[in-house]
Amino acid sequence: MRVVLADHGAGNVRSVAAAFGRAGATVALSTDPREVTEAQLVVVAGVGHVRSAARGLGALAGALRTRAERDRPTLGICVGLQLLFDESEEGGSGLGLLRGPVRRLRASLVPHMGWNDLGVVRASPLLGGLDGADVYFAHSYAAEPRDDVATALVEHGSPLVAAVEAGPLAGVQFHPERSGAAGARFLRNTLAWAGGW
């Protein structure tokens, strides 16, 4: 399967590309709206702030909205998950593909950085075999969905959304490219999920 990573200038995108390559995908990094619109699977990945990521997307924002309208699979990773939502407390609007804000963590330890158990709360083909798996997080903000789209939670002072899925849209707050065997399994699950659309 060919995976296109939407290039918005994030620094760790190449490690995500390499992880998808190890999972069996052919991977391209692109700033071309047409390529992003037509790809079999698009991934929006990276670390950083919603405002700078949204600005970095430029014309790709419209391509991602078109994908959602056409039921084409899109995965957000870390700030990519946050971009799927309406807005962020750190400033800036997201894509508005999922309803709800992104808010700063209220926990005493911010950022949430390190390994935590994933708690699957709704069956999802992307999370098959991953309930209770240790995955790696590095974030200071978390999505608060208005709709029932959360598929996994993580405990960090209080339950936080760790994964979402709504039709062809999915996102994870953890970093599969840094999550060892569990992350590799998630990426294989993602490729199988995207192949079914």
Task: Please place each PLM-identified region on the residue numbering.
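Short acidic low-complexity segments
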Residues: 27-38
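Structural alpha-helical scaffold elements that stabilize or flank donor/cofactor-binding regions
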Residues: 35-36, 67, 163
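Beta-strand-turn-beta hairpins that frame and shape the catalytic cleft
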Residues: 132, 165-170
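Pocket-forming structural segment of enzyme catalytic cores
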Residues: 86-160
